[in-house]
Amino acid sequence: MVLRLEGSWSLLVGKRFLSLSGDDDGPWDTERVAEWPWQAGRIRAVSHTDISKPDLKICVEFDDESWEKRRWIEVYSPKMKVFLVEQKLVLAERRSHGGSISPVQWPAMTYKSLVDKAGLGPMVSIRYLGEEKCVFLSKDLLTPIQDVESSRLPLKDDQTVNEEIQALVKKHLDETRLVQGGKNIIGSKIRIYSLDPSTQWFTAVVVNGNPATRTLEVNCQEIPALKTLDPELIHVEIIYDNNGKCDKSKRIGGVKRKPSENSGSVDAKHTKSSPEVSQSQGHVHSVPTVFGEALLGCTPANKDQRHQGLPLPANSPPNLGAETPQGTCRRSVPEVHPSCLNAGTKPLKENLTLFPKVTYITKEQTQNINDQNGKYTSLISSRSSSLSDSTNGKETGLKNISEPLLKPTTNFPKECISAKPLQHLNSSIAIPRVNSSVELQRTLDCRPSTSDAHLLPFTEAGVRSHSGSNSQKGNKVDEHVEMEFFTRRNSNEAFYERNENESFWTGSTKIQDNVIVRKSILADASKVKKLQQSGEAFVQDGSCNNIAPHLHKCRECRLDSYRKNKDQKDSTVFCRFFHFRRLQFNKHGILREEGFLTPNKYDPEAISLWLPLSKNVVGLDLDTAKYILANIGDHFCQLVISEKEVMSTIEPHRQVAWKRAVRGVREMCDVCDTTIFNLRWVCSKCGFGVCVDCYRMRKKGIHEDDDSDTFSWFKCVKGQEHEPENLMPTQIIPGRALYDVGDIVHSVRTKWGIKANCPCANKQFKALSKPTLKEDSKQNLVPGERTSLQQSNLVLSPQLPTHEPPVKPAAGSKQTASVTTSPSLSWLSNITSGNVNKENKEKLLVPISKNENKALQTLPSLAKPAAALQTFNSAILTPVSNNNTGFLRNLLNSSGGKTDNGLKSTPKILDDIFASLVQNRTVTDMPKKPQGLTIKPTIMGFDTPHYWLCDNRLLCLQDPNNESNWNVFRECWKQGQPVMVSGVHHKLNADLWRPESFRKEFGQQEVDLVNCRTNEIITGATVGDFWDGFEDISSRLRTEEGEPMVLKLKDWPPGEDFRDMMPSRFDDLMKNIPLPEYTRRGGKLNLASRLPNYFVRPDLGPKMYNAYGLITPEDRKYGTTNLHLDVSDAANVMVYVGIPKGQADQEEEVLKTIQDGDSDELTIKRFTESREKPGALWHIYAAKDTEKIREFLKKVAEEQGQENPVDHDPIHDQSWYLDRSLRKRLHQEYGVQGWAIVQFLGDVVFIPAGAPHQVHNLYSCIKVAEDFVSPEHVKHCFWLTQEFRYLSHTHTNHEDKLQVKNVIYHAVKDAVGILRANESSLSRS
């Protein structure tokens, strides 16, 4: 991270100041400013967070007085002549004492003027780092510091200055975390400034933080009544130990976190913004100034916990500086630090001192309003009163949501059980976005991986909070914190889940002290003795370093040699063999390896995650279940077949291992970063794991440039190469659950009349019978392990055995390994076949017309096979031929005469209309060129106002809240066409989306800006800089030539922070976003909602896109967002359009741009006649045309002398904007025509997954996009995931975050669960 310090610092408390006061009204001689009677000191408390309020009071300590004589002063009183507060670091000219050497640029702290009645004018007070006194210079002699590292270059030999810079950076980071809800300091010790005359400081421990109210919840033994405080009103500092580590209390339950010094990523560089508050919370916060036992800023707060951490590959060099986002867990975790970060990140020194030495000198008798009660509880800020109702309401809601979670999913040994009732703490968490190139370590799931006899008994209880040395009798509180880790092993991200309807937030993590891990069986001497005597095998229940340091260590445990101190080592959280590898004592009492768990060693808890429930599924109804199964049932079958094919290639003598899924861990391929669904190959020595595709490619010897692999493989122990034949086949899904569900799918589709078009009936695939589990004779089942699953809420086919003794395949079964992929096997099995290499990679992407015999020919077609459904009948499921893509529109826009049978008077849904029309109208009855007219509801018998744009190729729905929208939408959507919905701005709260509201709330945040004309990234700017020029060209940042720049905000809000930064805007958007069945997180047709909470849910937004307009004729060749495509579907909402002042003839230029963009007449009339506000010009292309566009761009690149690297892609690189000339060539040379769409204020553009698109802002726009996964486009989602494997690791899309296979599996699992639960209705009907 490069931390820029030229922006204003956010707090007054803790800052040094200079003041000049008295009755003398001057005049003051500025030539002798250094001789004025200045008073210096430090601010300890403030009465308001708004420094502009005229009644602002501050509690200060003066340098020439003792702290006991602190006082409250009025900043804007008549006697105050000048009041300066330290603000930012700059470079200032400094001459040597002799004056013979030319001046040098020296880092200095500037002071900002709050009051200046003496007329300082251009004079600025600064303090050179390394000195104590302040001097005054002209503003012209100051230069901004671009970053901390650049300021250190000329000062490498000055240790004092370097240390002070580091201390300032660390202080600034701590202030940011404190103000933003304690994001990285949960469990940290802090010291709080005391307004009690008897003491200056007292200590407390951070329990939780509330991002919405920006307050901290603390546990203070000195003042038990103190619960919450506001760090913006009272001086708070984090306490560090002698090693520069954040001191963590061992008394508070839950996960303890340490603040980080850097974030390791440009994306993560942004400071966490101040969260949005409601109108009731928006007044100026003030508190009375009270002494005695009084504390400023006491406010109610929600609980908040976070987690941190994780290391790089085993053969990567360590880098010990790291960002520390956080998470939550039900238990305390031993402290572990990541061993590495981005190579470009320079860590701060470990021995930094947070608090520069301050001399506290005397001051006058303080003026105060005595607290009548003399209690800390008597002082409540106005912020507290304004937030109490809303906060309590939120806490109540969270409590209700999380009450079902009180029963822990993790079983703990009796040694860890608390004797007292557990206190449940609600959690509300936000984690900053971080770079995705760093390998994360896994977090701990303490539930057992097997039910072997040696395992300790478990109970369903919480974890006792451990009391440290500071604990006092009578003050012990057992706290049970509902928390979970969500960490991806090989990507720098961690996830926390609020509840099943909420998304996850990401961030890199460091696991800190006090996560309580179940006591290892080896810690019990009596049990160890018994195991030694019996020779019984048991599962490794700790890290390699703790359990078996002399045996092979996994990749994470081997990284301990890079870690600096013992506290960082031996964490079970990181171990890849935890609850996976089996161990055994030999006859000499020496511990040795005894293989790994096998698929038949599952328990009901493990299998329940993968089998459908026998009761109705929340958020899913019968009709929707049928529709989902009709759309993705075949894809699921192909998924099962591909797994069977891989299993059939495994030699009979090879044992398949089972690695159970770990809660919150997204298992990734160590080579290509693709999410592993089930099968993979694992190294038994170090835990290295690769996906099916990477294994097959390596095994077949596919190389790139004849000297390197397409994907690099990390080396094993002692630098040994990982050879494919030495890797161990491993599955995640226990037992035969995958194949059992496949059988259930066929049974259910037959019973419900859902016609299947899967290749399961193909003779070639009949040979791929259900694989049998290979039994390890040494893994004996324990009593109780053979429990019948019929007692659980699982759906199993009656004929499917539950735990019959597995049978090893016969030697002749190897013949199935030679079965080649049939052309009838569609997209899924072919994509994962072994024919993917650098030579033929592009052949897989060839258009259908050029690759007739490829199984991928089904890719462009989004229509699903016919199915005899009751509600979703054959008409809606029948594929539409290519030459009749406008069939429905032709019918709907025709005269509407009755058919022979006549139309139903009140059809239930649109499908009935389609069925009736399709059965009774011929194509010859339809006009050849339908007119783009609005359909009258009375004609069709349903109320779905809409019209057609783009020459009748684009559906535009007019009522965003119409309940019939999704039926009309679905017909176009399933054919891969974009759709638009208008009028959403009438539903939204307009005040929330105005630029001034963003400027007011987040103006001081530091961000990166992008120059849309040059793609240059501008650093060191603030959010306020962007919004100042949003509607005022004269206020925009300018180039060196003095031209105003056309800018867009880069990744703001940063990462997945939208909900936490802007909760009211999030609620406003989710409440009014059209087609909620698809777009809401819990929408019944949003397949991402079917992924269980056990998994890491993908980040689907919302995300904001804020940019100026490109108005001039020269700007028409530039794009606000260049041509690209997304792995998921998206709904992009235009929430605000700003027409900037300061430029003439804007309307004329915008009209020319719209016309130049190939817009149709109806679109132009919306601008010229209806006077709607146009925001952005879109060009969207069908997903099936992607390869043609790719070939065209490569051709143009070659014409321009550009290279086309193998691991880059002209579309995924987002390096092209198709102007009119390129669009014309694309149409003429490749026959590709897209949709030219002008998005007006309130329009929502729906972009199908895999559809290339580009955006050109006409005016300044604020857009918000929400992603989703629809049943109609799952095929494209998977295809894109395969494409992204070939991108370089620098691409944001390289990593597979959508987990398409998991989404398909669990969506089908839930659908068949609903259908099985309603089979009784079939007999009645």
UniProtKB/Swiss-Prot annotation:
GO cellular component: chromatin; cytoplasm; histone deacetylase complex
Nucleus found in the keyword field: yes
Compositionally biased spans, kind Low complexity: 378-390
Cofactor note: Binds 1 Fe(2+) ion per subunit.
Principal location listed in the UniProt entry: cytoplasm
Function, in words: Histone demethylase that specifically demethylates 'Lys-9' of histone H3, thereby playing a central role in histone code. Preferentially demethylates mono- and dimethylated H3 'Lys-9' residue, with a preference for dimethylated residue, while it has weak or no activity on trimethylated H3 'Lys-9'. Demethylation of Lys residue generates formaldehyde and succinate.
Name this polypeptide is given: Lysine-specific demethylase 3A
Source organism: Gallus gallus (Chicken)
Source organism phylogeny: Eukaryota, Metazoa, Chordata, Craniata, Vertebrata
Underlying gene: KDM3A
